[in-house]
């Protein structure tokens, strides 16, 4: 199996991606397990931040790297929290604090204006100086609820209602979520690109 460093310390992302990628002969190792510090996310887009993270991990470990940059974009908030999704409630942000801040921010937003999208950009670098990284983007439409529901997933999943499924992302099984989520879509594109050379 090819060892690949996953440029994240987010346990939820590691679990989700490692299980999906192991089927394709990739041995995913979290950068934290290799003593790699997080890259500074100075980009203004999901794509820029994913490339920064992958390049940093590949440079430090001399291994191929995969990085994920993802977040929630709420239409009525002009795309916020966007690239700041993980830090939306401030420097000491937690999933619960971020979720509560978003619900508070949107408390007066009518039900017909609560559309949002999860975005995920996955970047694969063959090596730190790779001039042609594979960049794959997935997006997942939904609606922000007024109260959390479900115990699965992580992040904003308990308040992200998926109309096609009739439940929140946190109420989906891992298999259901992987089949339709932003990360699942980006991963399918990445695996197709890896298969085709």
Curated annotation (Swiss-Prot):
pH dependence: Optimum pH is 10-10.5. Optimum pH is 9.0. Reaction rates under neutral conditions are <40% of the maximum.
Disruption phenotype: Inactivation of this gene in a moa background (cells deficient in molybdopterin biosynthesis) results in increased N-6-hydroxylaminopurine (HAP) sensitivity, an increase in the level of mutagenesis, and increased recombination and SOS induction upon HAP exposure. A double deletion with priB is disadvantageous to cells.
Documented EC number(s): 3.6.1.66
Binding positions (substrate): 8-13, 70, 154-157, 177, 182-183
Catalytic activity: XTP + H2O = XMP + diphosphate + H(+); dITP + H2O = dIMP + diphosphate + H(+); ITP + H2O = IMP + diphosphate + H(+)
Residue positions of the active site: 69
Cofactor binding remark: Binds 1 divalent metal cation per subunit. Maximum activity is obtained with Mg(2+). Activity with Mn(2+) or Ni(2+) makes up 60-75% of the maximum rate.
Effect of residue 10 to A: Greatly reduced ITP pyrophosphatase activity
Role noted for this protein: Pyrophosphatase that catalyzes the hydrolysis of nucleoside triphosphates to their monophosphate derivatives, with a high preference for the non-canonical purine nucleotides XTP (xanthosine triphosphate), dITP (deoxyinosine triphosphate) and ITP. Can also efficiently hydrolyze 2'-deoxy-N-6-hydroxylaminopurine triphosphate (dHAPTP). Seems to function as a house-cleaning enzyme that removes non-canonical purine nucleotides from the nucleotide pool, thus preventing their incorporation into DNA/RNA and avoiding chromosomal lesions. Genetic interactions among priB, dam, lexA, nagC, polA, rdgB, rdgB, rep and uup link the PriA-PriB replication restart pathway to DNA double-strand break repair.
Name assigned to this protein: dITP/XTP pyrophosphatase
Gene assigned in the entry: rdgB
